[in-house]
A protein has these predicted regions:
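N-terminal secretory signal peptides that target proteins for export/translocation
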Residues: 1-17
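N-terminal non-cleavable signal-anchor helices
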Residues: 8, 22-26, 95
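Extended beta-strand/loop cores of jelly-roll/beta-sandwich
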Residues: 13, 43, 180-181
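Bacterial N-terminal signal peptides
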Residues: 19-33
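Short N-terminal segments immediately surrounding and downstream of signal-peptide cleavage
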Residues: 42-58
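A short Gly-Trp-Pro
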Residues: 50-51, 60-94, 99-186
Length: 186
């Protein structure tokens, strides 16, 4: 009878952190978590983000109603209504719920859509899921720390990524370069 060989898949030149622990966790999760397990951690250049868990009622108490609707009810603000569309200063855009930095101003571009748009994000700051609420499936993205809905990503952006992260302005807070970032919400 052939024996099974234990192999830890990894990206070339990048070892998977905590190999033995990762294998045990992956076996219990059906190997579905392998890409994420090897993408972050020691040697990856991406810091692990500790999730911020709050109930919907807690978020409702902390946020103005229009921000809560977008961030935790997956609402969308009207196109052209966000002052962040015109923001051109150097700085960072952070999640309006938990204050995790999501985008740098150097990635912002005018997409002509009426929403703040970015060609790339800070590594590890966003997660995605499929959104089937319209006739055509879309990819929704949200803050990796608090799960707050930010917007949708499309393949009609500018080089070098070709991506357009189309963000609700109310889901972001702009922090000008040289000013301290807000402390992460606890």
């Amino acid at each position: 009878m052939p024996t099974r060989k234990s192999v830890t898949p990894r990206k070339p030149g990048r070892p998977c952190p905590n190999g033995g622990v990762v294998i045990l966790v992956l076996l219990s999760l059906g190997l579905a978590a392998l890409p994420a397990a090897c993408a972050a951690g020691p040697g990856s250049g991406v810091a692990a983000i500790t999730p911020l868990v709050k109930s919907r009622d807690e978020w409702r108490r902390l946020l103005p109603p229009e921000r809560f609707d977008i961030l935790f009810e997956e609402g969308t603000e009207r196109a052209g209504t966000s002052p962040l569309n015109e923001e051109k200063r150097a700085g960072s855009f952070v999640c309006a719920a938990c204050f995790l930095p999501l985008f740098e101003s150097k990635e912002k571009f005018n997409s002509g859509t009426g929403w703040p748009s970015f060609s790339d994000f800070i590594p590890g700051s966003l997660e995605t899921k499929h959104d089937y609420r319209l006739f055509t499936p879309r990819t929704e993205y949200h803050c990796a720390r608090c799960g707050g809905h930010q917007g949708h990503v499309f393949d009609d952006g500018i080089p070098p990524t070709g991506k357009r992260y189309c963000n609700n302005g109310l889901a972001l807070v702009f922090v000008p370069a040289g000013e301290p970032l807000p402390a992460l919400r606890q």
